[in-house]
Amino acid sequence: MAVTKLVLVRHGESQWNNENRFTGWYDVDLSDKGRTEAKAAGQLLKKEGFTFDFAYTSVLKRAIHTLWNILDEVDQVWLPVEKSWRLNERHYGALQGLDKAETANKYGDEQVKQWRRGFAVTPPELDRADERFPGHDPRYASLTAEQLPTTESLALTIDRVLPYWNESILPRMKSGEKVIIAAHGNSLRALVKYLDNMSEEEILELNIPTGVPLVYEFDENFKPIKHYYLGDADEIAAKAAAVANQGKAK
């Protein structure tokens, strides 16, 4: 049976992950730890014999630089790369830039958990006059007013990720190309929910660690057979737990 593999990687730790702030579409870079994580991901992929034909990432530098570091480690910096806003992190609305723990102290752990992980829950909306609104950013100049978010739930994130999966990524895989996607916690959760047919309750508890390759294997009909992380299982579990704890009051 022919098996097709897809590699998903959440970007390495960003500067705002390190500061425990809501990031969303704000374009922060990797922290030093994040760059180390990205390089380690590339080294793991090289050790396991992975090579690629095409790469996808978002238009945010923390994902782009993660991909650069991975491709450098697997000696494929020449690889064609497609960047799309559809792979961006979920837009966190007016929460962007706020400290997660301070927000939890103010609104409570459960409210912040719903804002961070709830399927259909949207954070407080961003005013379109706010400098954080993506309509002020030239990289989004080609988007329509309806496509520019002022806030997003995971459900809305899925609505923009899945068309891109079906129209661009999956056809490339079906043509035989080996694909890697470097993206974000919630754009990848959106894809994982679809691939694994997860319920809204199940996706609430899913936390994707930074900088760890997640491998999906598909059968000849491009149905997922299994998935697994590369690396030490205990370390990966600890990193996922740390992601879950970011939104709790101190």
From Swiss-Prot:
Group of enzyme by EC: isomerase
Catalytic residue list: H11, E89
One GO-annotated biological process of the protein: gluconeogenesis
NCBIfam families on file: pgm_1, PRK14115.1
GO molecular function terms attached to this record: phosphoglycerate mutase activity
Keyword Membrane found: no
Reaction it catalyzes: (2R)-2-phosphoglycerate = (2R)-3-phosphoglycerate
Site (Transition state stabilizer): H184
One Pfam entry name: His_Phos_1
Enzyme Commission designation: 5.4.2.11
UniProt entry keywords in alphabetical sequence: Gluconeogenesis, Glycolysis, Isomerase
Name this protein carries in UniProt: 2,3-bisphosphoglycerate-dependent phosphoglycerate mutase
SMART domains attached to this UniProt entry: PGAM
Function: Catalyzes the interconversion of 2-phosphoglycerate and 3-phosphoglycerate.
Annotated binding of substrate, by residue: 10-17, 23-24, 62, 89-92, 100, 116-117, 185-186
